Amino acid sequence: MASTAPNEQFPSCVRCKEFITTGHAYELGCDRWHTHCFACYKCEKPLSCESDFLVLGTGALICFDCSDSCKNCGKKIDDLAIILSSSNEAYCSDCFKCCKCGENIADLRYAKTKRGLFCLSCHEKLLAKRKYYEEKKRRLKKNLPSLPTPVIDNGHTDEVSASAVLPEKTFSRPASLVNEIPSGSEPSKDIETNSSDIVPHFITGYNDSDDNSGSSKFGSNVSIDVIGPEENSTEHVNDDVKEEAEAPSANMSLNVATDPTLSCKEPPSHSRNLLNKTPLRNSSGQYLAKSPSSYRQGIIVNDSLEESDQIDPPNNSSRNASELLTSVLHSPVSVNMKNPKGSNTDIFNTGEISQMDPSLSRKVLNNIVEETNALQRPVVEVVKEDRSVPDLAGVQQEQAEKYSYSNNSGKGRKISRSLSRRSKDLMINLKSRATGKQDSNVKLSPASKVTSRRSQDLMRDNDSHTGLDTPNSNSTSLDILVNNQKSLNYKRFTDNGTLRVTSGKETALEEQKNHSFKSPSPIDHLLQSPATPSNVSMYRTPPLDSSLTFDRRNGSSYSNQNYSIPSWQKTPKTQLENSDNFEEQKETLYENSESRNDPSLDKEIVTAEHYLKQLKINLKELESQREELMKEITEMKSMKEALRRHIESYNSEKNKLYLDSNELSNNPPMINEISLGESPPVKHVATASSVARSSVKPKFWKFFSSAKPQTEQSIQGVSTNNTNSIVKSAPVLLSAPSSGSNSGRLEISPPVLQNPNEFSDVRLVPIENDANMGQSKDGEEYLDGSNLYGSSLVARCNYENNEIPMILSVCIDFIESDEENMRSEGIYRKSGSQLVIEEIEKQFSAWKVQQNTETPNILTEQDLNVVTGVLKRYLRKLPNPIFTFQIYEPLMRLVKSKKMMENLPFVGGKLSLEAKNSDTYMSSKSALKNILEDLPREHYRVLRVLSEHIEKVTRYSHWNRMTLYNLALVFAPGLIRDFSGEKDIIDMKERNYIVAFIFGNYKDILT
């Protein structure tokens, strides 16, 4: 117990846990540290009471440089720091908050994202919102089914060997070859049709994009209708199949049988099944209107009145008599037409329809999808019959016929084709191209007029049929059409005005030439009504008035060319209008068609116009801003020119004043007393002679008028016995009334580099009115060095009889007396208390050599930074600095000419051995020695003593962090400066370098 009792009396160090028995110690609250333990735990940097440091919760010390910075605001954290465990990022308590709601994060529960920190509530909301949008995106994603590939049944592909059978030629039908289908082929099937089941497979007139053959848009439309079985007539179809197996059809068009596009067989219901599986596409706007379902019932047009009794009514048992009557009233009228020779009706096997090429079938299915909604209209079924006039499809080669067949049994039904009414939008835009050029001699028959009126009435209905699906009585034209399905025919006008049909085959061209007709009517697109009902084709191209034109409306595409449709009389040629008028009207038609835009294009035009207006407004704003900027630029240019002229005048004035000041310095004037009769005594003001730079550089001086007392300043110089240098003395301010000789002259004071407000010993001294007195007592006291802050270094040394001033030696001895002072961090860099420094300066100024022979003990118990401040301040207040004004320019020229900063750089605060062994170093050293020889002896000794002291301080640079170059930065402003003070910024680097170079190599330079 006796051994531990003494240890309990001593405090223990917080860091090393050892007892503090001797020496100094740092105390912070109840904790104590050794002086060597009071350091940063990271960088081991020694700390002091003036250092910026923090005490961690563990008791460890950390300096300001090593402390954590906030990740958000970037400021040093001087209190509580929150460090994230995942990223090791530090946040201050103010920045540790949610970036969404801005609330502080409680309980250190957070979520870190790329956007920043989130509290848990905001993070959960963000996750829920993201999940909701992903689910919504997944629901809205559409996957449209792809078009099914047509299935080709190879089991039914039998080659069709057709033998040509020449049917009986009639007066109204030219000869055409038909094929007799052998008994080994698949029996044809009788199909019961209904208007609701009829869907065209291929109608190019409504979709120009599918027409890849380059044919005309209107005259080259090909329509292939596939008639599928009705769902509620299955038994009837099966009976027809059985009867068709016993007696297959014997006749078929030779060209249809031999067409390569009909080489594959498919079940008759295959197209219907594919239609049911195909998704409906969006159709254009003109096909959206549909008639009611009750009206979608076609009427059968019979060949004879006798056969009309055998045709069963449409299979729709759910409809009552009133509905049937209404549908009949709203449907096209039935026309009974006599067939002069019904046995020669062109028929073909519907089994061959399924034998189409897959490419054609796919195209057919695509067109079915596009036209399904448009073609559910009331239709008229007309039994195919022979005609003695050329069919309309024979002229317009690309409009396909719809074929049907039936056997001669009692149950068999005449297969008819669908003739739905033309679209209202198409028919209302028809107009004759020959308006105004009609032959006045040609008159239409009453039947033709009735047909014209009926066609106009039909245009008012929602007719969706092409209007060109008429029975083909010209079998040669039909053969040409079927034979050239792969290469669709082109219609063009020849030079002689005849209509020519060209195709890939020469035979088709020749046959078409032989069967082209001339219409006696000059009215284009107008069909004359024949005299007999046998020549009537219901709902083909309706007769039009001359006021109707072909036009493009609502996005529907029709032909821009005008074709003359032959009448139903046997005439050999087609009459066309004049070619010049045709070209002129075609251009007019093109302009009219282009002038009408669809709604989407109109919307785009409106949007584009809106954007154009906005751009024009922005352009006007930019132009106005540009004008304002140009005005400002012009004003700035004029201002710049005015400033340049002022600067030039000021520079010339400055140079003149500088020359005057040099003359005054070389020839210091004697200040004489000016006396005028009964004028009041003149006051002489003497100020402390410090040439230290003021805070505001006196570059301009005030002009005094002749009516006021003029001020004159002069810089007095005293030539010493030992040196030739001129020591600047304190300026003397003399005020005197203006005399008669200089009343009209403006006096300009010379530049003075001092700030009298900086010194405490400024006092006003009255001047005796004695003309023989050269200078005042204060001037004599100033010149002998008795005044501390006003005497030159040479005068002060002579006054004290010392090699260096006492204030310098006392300060240096105090700093070097204690090793702790030399290790103090930031020595000469940190500033002491200004009040204490001024108090010490007053004590040094009051000390007199004659009264006190001993060195004063002024710096006892003073702070280190206060003592270093007194030393630096005395050097800075010297009227002529240590490196005098006379050697300033030679030193700067030496540094710049030798390029010492580039060739002899400081590395780690000192010159390297390689640099010291270079020729540049040797030449620079010798030149520098020659320049420093011009210094006064007192300046030279002070420079050497100061260099030795700086070397001792740099030995402790590991502790005090003050290298040679850092100390040079501190001392350079007080040791070297130019006389005018204008080159402080320009020569700053050179001044700092030369001071560091001399401090580091003073042993070689200051010998």
UniProtKB/Swiss-Prot annotation:
GO cellular component: cell cortex; cell division site; cell tip; cellular birth scar; cellular bud; cellular bud neck; cellular bud neck split septin rings; cellular bud scar
Biased composition (Polar residues): 250-261, 270-293, 467-478, 529-579
GO biological process, one term: small GTPase-mediated signal transduction
UniProt biased composition (Basic residues): 411-421
Chain positions with Phosphothreonine modification: T278, T532
Molecular function terms, GO-annotated: GTPase activator activity; metal ion binding
Keyword annotations of the record: GTPase activation, LIM domain, Metal-binding, Pheromone response, Phosphoprotein, Repeat, Zinc
Biased composition range(s): Basic and acidic residues: 454-466, 583-600
InterPro entries: Rho-GAP, Rho_GTPase_activation_prot, RhoGAP_dom, Znf_LIM
Region (Disordered): 203-293, 401-478, 505-600
Site (Arginine finger): R829
Limits of the Rho-GAP domain: 791-1006
Low complexity: bias regions: 212-221
Alphabetized Pfam families for the sequence: LIM, RhoGAP
Phosphoprotein listed as a keyword: yes
Modification Phosphoserine occurs at: S291
CDD domains: LIM1_Rga, LIM2_Rga, RhoGAP
Domain LIM zinc-binding stretches: 13-66, 70-122
Gene3D superfamilies: Cysteine Rich Protein, Rho GTPase activation protein
Further information: Present with 396 molecules/cell in log phase SD medium.
Biological function: GTPase-activating protein (GAP) for CDC42 and/or RHO1. Negative regulator of the pheromone-response pathway through the STE20 protein kinase; acts at a step between the G-protein and the MAP kinase module. Dominant suppressor of bud emergence defect caused by deletion of IPL2/BEM2. Involved in the control of polarized cell growth and proper bud site selection.
Protein name: Rho-type GTPase-activating protein 1
Organism: Saccharomyces cerevisiae (strain ATCC 204508 / S288c)
Gene: RGA1
